[in-house]
A protein has these predicted regions:
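Long, charged, low-complexity intrinsically disordered regions
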Residues: 1-77
Length: 77
């Protein structure tokens, strides 16, 4: 997991994160950086990783979009 800032937007890169850890990592990231929304979550090409991130965000009523396949943008809490 890598957190970086690009063009003023904070990114979470989930490459290398185990599927069982995705939900906790995503929710921790969103709440830790909520003042910086919008946020980007890079899931990569794994459909399962994308599903896990969407599930975690939906469970916590977090509004998001997917501007490109494998990239999720957190819009608001």
């Amino acid at each position: 997991m890598k957190i970086s800032k690009e063009n003023g937007i904070t990114h979470l890169d989930l490459h290398g994160v185990r599927h069982q850890d995705v939900s906790d990592e995503v929710i921790d990231f969103v709440f830790q950086y909520q003042k910086d929304i919008p946020l980007m979550i890079i899931c990569g090409n794994s459909n399962r990783m994308i599903e896990l991130v969407e599930e975690a965000l939906n469970t916590n009523c977090i509004v998001f979009s997917m501007p490109r396949f494998g990239i999720i943008r957190v819009e608001k809490l």
